[in-house]
Amino acid sequence: DCPSDWSSFKQYCYQIIKQLKTWEDAERFCLDQMKGAHLVSIESYREAVFVAELLSENVKTTKYHVWIGLSVQNKGQQCSSEWSDGSTVSYENLVKPNPKKCFVLKKESEFRTWSNVYCEQKHIFMCKFLGSR
C-alpha cells in the first residue's frame, strides 16, 4: 500500500515533487521523504507508460523537465549509467563522453524519452519507493 498522497503501480509508490532542485538535491529530498525512496527508476515499458501518464496528468506546462534517477557515474576510466536506487539499467545505452550526466523526462516527448542534461540544472522530479505489502 502507498501513502495517500502517492500513486501506485505494481508494488511501487510514486510522487511528483513540484520543487525545482538539482539532481543531487532531488535525490536527497526523495531519501528524506520516505525510507527507501529515490528518484524514479524506469525498469520496463509498462512502467514508462505509467510514469508518462502520471506526469502528463499533473504537469501541464512545457517549461518543466522532470528528473529521473538515471545518471552517468565516472568509475575511474569507465563511465556507466546507473539508477540511483541501484536497479539495473536493462537496455544497451552507449554513453559518449558528455558533461551532461543526469537525465530528465521532457513534456515535448510526452515524458517518454530520456534526455541528458547538466546535473546542476534545477527541475521538478518524481520519487519512487517499494510499497508495503
From Swiss-Prot:
Subcellular location: Secreted
Top-level taxon of the source organism: Eukaryota
GO biological process, one term: venom-mediated platelet aggregation
GO MF term set: toxin activity
Annotated SMART domains: CLECT (SM00034)
Residue ranges of every copy of the C-type lectin domain listed in the record: 9-128
GO cellular component: extracellular region; other organism cell membrane
Keywords on record: Disulfide bond, Hemostasis impairing toxin, Platelet aggregation activating toxin, Secreted, Toxin
Summary of the tissues where the protein is detected: Expressed by the venom gland.
Keyword Ubl conjugation: no
Primary location recorded for the protein, binned into one broad class: secreted
Cross-referenced InterPro entries: C-type_lectin-like (IPR001304), C-type_lectin-like/link_sf (IPR016186), C-type_lectin/snaclec_domain (IPR050111), C-type_lectin_CS (IPR018378), CTDL_fold (IPR016187)
Disulfide bonds: C2-C13, C30-C127, C102-C119
Coiled-coil intervals, chain numbering: none
Quaternary organization: Homodimer (non-covalently linked) of heterodimer of alpha and beta subunits (disulfide-linked).
Function of the molecule: Snaclec that induces platelet aggregation without any cofactor in a dose-dependent manner. Its platelet aggregation effect is blocked by echicetin, suggesting it is a GPIb-binding protein which binds to the same or a closely related GPIb site on platelets as echicetin.
Family indicated by similarity: Belongs to the snaclec family.
Protein name: Snaclec purpureotin subunit alpha
